[in-house]
Design a protein with these regions (language model features):
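Penicillin-recognizing serine hydrolase domain
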Residues: 1-113
Length: 113
């Protein structure tokens, strides 16, 4: 299903072998294809809200008495790790890291001119 959708979006150098993005010899996505996928994803209002959230707190549960804070580590939208990389037009993004790929980043910005 993911491979069919990627092809529908115009991706030509992508093959998903799992749904979690973790390393697999047959799991590949080019930067161009990731841009195509991301351009489609940002059109979804829930996705846009999630990737643009700076901080979220999971309420207490029967397993955890205190709230659990989740901080966005994307330095262009969140000052969690300092303010030097904040970008006023950034509306969201997704950071990532695996031992095979190293650091990864997709970022969305809008500037009305």
């Amino acid at each position: 299903m993911m491979n069919a959708k990627a092809a529908e979006l115009g991706c030509t150098n992508t093959h998903f072998n799992n749904c979690n993005g973790l390393p697999d010899p047959n799991h590949v996505v080019s930067a161009r294809d990731m841009a195509l996928i991301s351009r489609e994803a940002i059109k979804n209002s829930m996705f846009r809200k999630i990737v643009g959230t700076v901080r979220y707190e999971i309420p207490p549960t029967n397993k955890h008495a205190d709230p659990t804070p989740l901080n966005n580590h994307h330095q262009m939208i969140s000052a969690y790790k300092g303010r030097q990389n904040l970008y006023e037009y950034c509306v969201g993004g997704k950071t990532g890291w695996t031992s095979d790929a190293g650091n990864t980043l997709v970022t969305f910005a809008e500037k009305m001119v």
